[in-house]
Amino acid sequence: MAASLSELSTYLGERLIGRVNDADIAYGELTMHVEPRNLIEVVTFLRDDQRCQFISIIDVCGADYPSRPKRFDVVYHLLSPKQNVRIRLKVQADEETMVPSITGVFPGADWFERETYDLYGVLFSGHPDLRRLLTDYGFEGHPLRKDFPLTGFVEVRYDDEAKRVIYEPVELKQEFRNFDFLSPWEGTDYVLPGDEKAKTN
């Protein structure tokens, strides 16, 4: 498997000169880093080339690295059923950089790109319907960004008296507690405050 991935990496490096920044093989998967301006050309080649035949899009997802100038990785997972090989493409972007939509090449990427936009705020140029998919219409922010607060900004609940959904500021019912366990791998064999009331066998 590693030999075939290495051969594929060499082949793609020769065929996509200047369009792929670099490629590496890790954990049995080939990853190629691509600039946004080259994405459509690379994806089209991977789909149409007779040796590759990556005809199935598995997923499009995001990753957030706030310390980088281009904080987002948009990651494309493609499958070649004929070759029984997967490939991963990574494109870096920031809040303003628009990544070209690949829905013209893979129509199935439509909701994957909407999900990435909704959860990370990555913008896709040329997308036919770039709007939120998983969060509510009036939702503020993008919940999978590392700088998004754990509690969110508002609390949404259905009010039975008003017979509608209402939005309220987040109200924590108890103060934040930090549990200090000696070892998360061993479990606790000591009594924490309040546990002395519990029966132990």
Swiss-Prot record:
GO terms for cellular component: plasma membrane. PROSITE patterns: COMPLEX1_30K. NDH-1 is composed of 14 different subunits. Subunits NuoB, C, D, E, F, and G constitute the peripheral sector of the complex. NDH-1 shuttles electrons from NADH, via FMN and iron-sulfur (Fe-S) centers, to quinones in the respiratory chain. The immediate electron acceptor for the enzyme in this species is believed to be ubiquinone. Couples the redox reaction to proton translocation (for every two electrons transferred, four hydrogen ions are translocated across the cytoplasmic membrane), and thus conserves the redox energy in a proton gradient. It catalyses: a quinone + NADH + 5 H(+)(in) = a quinol + NAD(+) + 4 H(+)(out). It is a peripheral membrane protein. This is NADH-quinone oxidoreductase subunit C. The lineage of its organism: Bacteria, Pseudomonadati, Pseudomonadota, Alphaproteobacteria, Hyphomicrobiales. Its EC number is 7.1.1.-. HAMAP family: NDH1_NuoC (MF_01357). The gene is nuoC.
